[in-house]
Regions:
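Conserved catalytic-core segment of nucleotide-activated headgroup transferases in glycan assembly
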Residues: 40-45, 206-288, 393-399
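Catalytic donor nucleotide-activated moiety binding site of glycosyltransferases and closely related
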Residues: 60-71, 145, 258-304
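Extended catalytic core of nucleotide-activated donor transferases of GT-like folds
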Residues: 66-131, 149-165
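Catalytic binding pocket for nucleotide-activated donors in carbohydrate/polymer assembly enzymes
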Residues: 325-389
Length: 621
């Protein structure tokens, strides 16, 4: 794409388009895409141009090194795609871009430029070549060098806020430069006075979509697999070596990820990752998944960079991030933030993002993680800057942008209200721990268990206060549960890659619908696992959000049922294992039920014989 490559299209534009058009008396609006990142902002505003009088077109400048993913994205949008060379020779009524780069000044029509992040905050050198490639992130041979008479490094220009990016031959490239806040206008006037008259304050459509979706936070949490008492931690990284994902600074993430899954109880915390599209499409989705494979087996959900990241921010209890726009959006929503990477190089020191990076709390990788996360949540006070400076017209970007677009096109606006698409409800993505779990339990009475599960800890996790540790295998005396020791067992998903861990597990589990023809009935699968794995004491088939079937080595088969929002049924099964190990008879659990304390919540679990013809009265298991 770009570079003029590709056959020129013949309809609905081209020399003979009039012969082939079905609707030719329309105004042409060209969407100018640089990469997937900039395209996301154009997707935000597409609903404002749904009009019988408008023909949408798209093109890609080819100026960004991040070209992967663009053809697929434009194909999904489903509008005619012009090669860049044809786009520059096609008269349009309006061109809309969300970045600078390529020969934008050669577009044959009026040009509106949006920001593809939270305003303009980063410095970036322009290349020597005749075209601009703002996404390249590389310095030209002379950029940043000391000149003989200067004696000091010349700072790079601020991307989107400097003559180098905004002017050609002293004239503004854009007819309208959309800003979201007067703070940006003040910096623009100071940095590039000739372009100031093109500025239009029209808000932030991306942020407005998030604000509009705030009432649906609980739905988003359920969609992302959050259960009662569980907290969602979002790991967010922009691109470049100084980012949280990058290896140009402390290279924190490779060591942080196993600590997060090993130190945070799996039922107390849900982990998701939101990575910049330039990470995905620069290194390749397959490579990104490979780098994060171990963490994903430990329960990390890796979100598509286009689909659900905003819903994740709305659902989050905490974001661990860096100097990118997504982390700033999280702070603007009032979500607690800890910075895992906080570089100031490359940021405009006068920008709100730079001020946020200077003042936001940091994650200390040398200290235990869980206390830091819990303090960040409990002691959180929203940052005023992000909330106030992201947009000066919250909820109004749709109306303001549509008015601007139609003024530039030269058409009266449609009579219907200007509306952005609501954020969709994500697909249900429950956590999957396809790894071994270290399970710590303490019996509070014969039918009540306190429980914590840790994914692949490299050391015995520090005991939370709720699980005071006593001498292994001993009781501190008193009634059941009074000073009872913390006991440990291993639970493993059947698909755990480490087959030795599966072979040694006390509890083996899997998640699948009860009618999965590949596995057979849940009770039969449980019997098969026990026959194949002599070390296993309990097999667990999780068939629904609140239901599992378990079978003991002596053949007692039970169904555990709880509310769908309660803990993972595999956790309930581990609690049952603890009760049975302590001598509680299955018939007593059937009569009294099971109570599981985990994730700051108390879950009631009903225990019934899996086969109504059996009463579960056996005491051995």
């Amino acid at each position: 794409m770009g570079e003029g490559a590709g056959a020129w299209i013949r309809v609905p534009v081209g020399a003979e388009a009039g012969r082939w058009d079905t609707r030719g008396s329309v105004r042409r609006v060209l969407l100018v895409v640089h990469n997937v990142t900039s395209a996301t902002r154009l997707l935000d505003v597409l609903p404002l141009l749904r009009d019988w009088r408008v023909q949408l077109l798209a093109t890609c400048t080819g100026s960004s090194p991040f070209q992967a993913g663009v053809p697929e994205l434009l194909a999904e949008v489903g509008v005619p795609v012009l090669p860049w060379a044809q786009a520059l020779r096609t008269r349009v009524d309006l061109a809309v871009s969300a970045s600078f780069g390529g020969q934008l000044h050669e577009v044959c029509g009026r040009l509106a430029v949006l920001s593809h992040g939270v305003g303009y905050n980063k410095t970036l050198a322009t290349p020597d070549a005749g075209r601009r490639t703002p996404d390249a992130g590389r310095r030209t041979p002379d950029a940043g060098r000391r000149t003989p008479d200067a004696g000091r490094r010349t700072p790079d220009p601020v991307f989107g806020m400097s003559d180098a990016w905004l002017l050609v031959d002293g004239e503004p490239i854009a007819d309208a430069m959309v800003l979201s806040h007067p703070e940006q206008l003040a910096r623009l006037r100071a940095a590039c006075p000739p372009a100031a008259h093109t500025a239009v304050l029209a808000g932030d459509p991306c942020f407005d979509r998030m604000l509009d979706a705030r009432p649906y936070r609980d739905r988003f949490r359920r969609a992302l697999g959050l259960r009662a008492g569980q907290r969602l931690v979002v790991l967010n990284s922009t691109w470049n070596p100084a980012s949280l994902f990058g290896d140009g600074g402390d290279d924190l993430l490779p060591s942080l990820l196993p600590r997060l899954t090993g130190e945070l109880p799996a039922d107390d915390y849900r982990l998701t990752a939101v990575l910049h599209p330039n990470i995905w499409h620069g290194h390749g989705p397959g490579q990104v998944r490979a780098w994060l494979e171990r963490a994903r087996r430990g329960g990390l959900a890796l979100l598509d960079p286009l689909a659900d990241w905003r819903q994740a921010l709305l659902a989050a209890d905490l974001v661990i991030g860096d100097h990118g726009s997504v982390t700033y959006y999280a702070a603007a929503l009032g979500t607690p933030v800890l910075l895992g990477a906080a570089p100031l190089d490359g940021l405009d020191p006068a920008s709100p993002v730079a001020e946020f990076v200077r003042t936001a709390p940091r994650l200390d990788p040398l200290r235990p993680l869980r206390p830091q996360l819990e303090s960040a949540i409990s002691d959180h006070r929203p940052h005023r800057g992000p909330a106030e400076l992201t947009t000066s017209v919250p909820g109004k970007s749709a109306a303001l942008l549509r008015t601007l677009f139609y003024d530039l096109i030269g058409l009266p606006e449609p009579d219907a209200p200007a509306l952005l698409d609501p954020l969709p409800l994500p697909d249900h993505t429950p956590p999957r721990h396809t790894t071994s779990l270290r399970v710590l339990t303490r019996l509070l009475d014969p039918h009540e268990v306190e429980l914590r599960r840790y994914a692949e800890p490299t050391y015995e996790p520090e005991e939370p206060e709720e699980l005071p540790e006593g001498p292994a295998g001993t009781s501190r005396g008193g009634r059941p549960g009074d000073g009872e020791p913390v006991r440990a067992h291993t639970a493993a998903h059947e698909d755990t890659a480490d087959r030795e861990a599966v072979a040694a597990a006390d509890v083996i589990f899997r998640h699948s619908p009860a009618d999965d023809p590949r596995l057979g009935p849940p009770a039969a699968w449980c019997a098969e696992v026990l026959a194949r794995r002599p070390q296993c004491a309990l097999a667990v088939y999780v068939s629904a959000p609140g239901t599992c079937t378990v079978r003991t080595r002596t053949g007692v088969t039970l169904t555990l049922t709880a509310d769908a929002s309660a803990a993972d049924p595999a956790a309930h099964a581990s609690a049952l294992f603890a009760c049975l190990s302590a001598g509680t008879a299955p018939r007593s659990l059937i009569a009294n039920g099971l109570t599981v304390r985990t994730a700051r919540a108390r879950h009631r679990v009903t225990v019934t014989p899996a086969d109504p013809a059996e009463d579960g009265t056996g005491t051995a298991w």
